């Protein structure tokens, strides 16, 4: 189960960009593997051939995906990487699925909310 989502602040744990803090731009699921594109991380130069009437040729910088295991959720209050957990909260007749900070126990955000059916 993926506990991170688009727009989350993350810190890079390994590689040439180790220690960089940024936000997730995209999550890619392919062949049972999960990769993420992080803003300003794993930037490479790509040489593009010109296509007449479509684009100019040249060198452009693009962000390549990195494995999700190489990033961790970054808690901006404590300025440290933390593990994210899932918890179900029952309030009256509502059930909410929330993401929590495993270290402090505080709620990061709600994933979904449903109303309990009466039997």
Curated annotation (Swiss-Prot):
Pfam families: ribosomal_L24. GO terms for molecular function: rRNA binding; structural constituent of ribosome. Keywords: Ribonucleoprotein, Ribosomal protein, RNA-binding, rRNA-binding. GO terms for cellular component: ribonucleoprotein complex; ribosome. The keyword rRNA-binding applies. The keyword rRNA-binding applies. GO terms for biological process: translation. Belongs to the universal ribosomal protein uL24 family. NCBIfam families: rplX_bact (TIGR01079). Part of the 50S ribosomal subunit. One of two assembly initiator proteins, it binds directly to the 5'-end of the 23S rRNA, where it nucleates assembly of the 50S subunit. One of the proteins that surrounds the polypeptide exit tunnel on the outside of the subunit. This is Large ribosomal subunit protein uL24. It comes from Sulfurihydrogenibium sp. (strain YO3AOP1). The gene is rplX.
């Amino acid at each position: 189960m993926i506990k991170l989502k688009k727009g989350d602040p993350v810190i890079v744990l390994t590689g040439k960009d180790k220690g960089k803090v940024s936000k997730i731009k995209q999550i890619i699921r392919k062949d049972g593997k999960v990769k993420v594109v992080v803003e300003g991380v794993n930037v490479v130069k790509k040489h593009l051939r010109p296509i007449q009437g479509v684009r100019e040729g040249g060198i452009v910088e693009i962000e390549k995906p990195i494995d999700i295991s190489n990033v961790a959720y970054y808690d901006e209050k404590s300025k440290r990487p933390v593990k994210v957990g899932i918890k179900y909260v029952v309030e009256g007749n509502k059930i909410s699925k929330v993401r929590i900070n495993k270290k402090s126990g505080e709620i990061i955000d709600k994933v979904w909310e449903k109303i309990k059916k009466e039997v």
